Structures are given as C-alpha cells and as structure tokens.
Amino acid sequence: MLDKLDGALRFQQEALNLRAQRQEILSANIANADTPGFQARDIDFSSQLQKVMEQGRVNGSGMSLSLTAARHIPAQNIQPPDLDLLFRVPDQPSMDGNTVDMDRERTNFADNSLKYQTDLTILGGQIKGMMSVLQQG
C-alpha cells in the first residue's frame, strides 16, 4: 500500500525538488550579475524531471536516516540527482564576459516560483484527497 501512495505522490515530489534546485541556480545567476566572467547557468526542467523519474532517487548513498524506535519503518537512502547544468548563451555579450541577463533571470525566477507554488497546491490537493478517502474508511 505504501508503494501506491509513494507512486501517487512521487511525480509532484520530484518536480518540487527540481524546482527548488532550479531556484538556487537562478538565484546564483542573479547574485553574480556583476561578477566578471561569470557564466549564467540553468537546467532543462522537463528533461531533468524525465531523467529523475526514469532512474529514481534511491541509487547510491545519500543522507542516512536513523531509526529511533523498533517499530519505525526503515527508509531508503536519498541522494539528489546529478543535474546537467547548461550554460546560457547571451543575447548581447558583455565586455567582461558575464552572460547574466537580469531581465531573463528575473523572468525565469518569477516563472519558476509560480510553478513551485502551483506544484505545492497540486500536491496539497492530492494529500487532502487521500486523507478524505482514509477518513471515510
């Protein structure tokens, strides 16, 4: 039964994890907008999500989870996926070699934030639906 619950929520969980990682990448781009020679990076979200869904996240050794009681269910190790970072090609190169376009970064940051909130809303709806089914018996 836990496998079915995990399968139902896994897609949204992976999407949220990738969106959070993308937000960190976009934040780093914005923070380094004035750094000479900094190369703006991003990920192809759809291909990364497909990659994560195909391979799963249970491979390798990630953070270890400890049991504090004998009746606890042991969890598998979790490891963040290896992201394929892409370097952004600037529309208009700068003299110092920095490829950060602040308009593009702010737009991508806001778009990613909105999609993150949408994913949270969808996940919350799925959990509420499961809770109502479990409570009704």
UniProtKB/Swiss-Prot annotation:
Location relative to the cell: Bacterial flagellum basal body
Chief site of localization: other
Statement: the UniProt record of this protein carries the keyword DNA-binding: no
Keywords, comma-separated and alphabetical: Bacterial flagellum
InterPro entries: Flag_bb_rod_N (IPR001444), Flagellar_basal_body_rod_CS (IPR019776), FlgB (IPR006300)
GO cellular component term of the entry, any: bacterial-type flagellum basal body, rod
GO biological process, one term: bacterial-type flagellum-dependent cell motility
Alphabetical list of Pfam families matching this protein: Flg_bb_rod (PF00460)
Subunit structure: The basal body constitutes a major portion of the flagellar organelle and consists of a number of rings mounted on a central rod. In Gram-negative bacteria, at least four rings, L, P, S and M are present, whereas Gram-positive bacteria lack the L and P rings. The rod consists of about 26 subunits of FlgG in the distal portion, and FlgB, FlgC and FlgF build up the proximal portion of the rod with about 6 subunits each.
Family that this chain belongs to: Belongs to the flagella basal body rod proteins family.
Cited PANTHER family: FLAGELLAR BASAL BODY ROD PROTEIN FLGB, FLAGELLAR PROTEIN
Annotated function: Structural component of flagellum, the bacterial motility apparatus. Part of the rod structure of flagellar basal body.
Record-given protein name: Flagellar basal body rod protein FlgB
Organism: Yersinia ruckeri
Gene: flgB
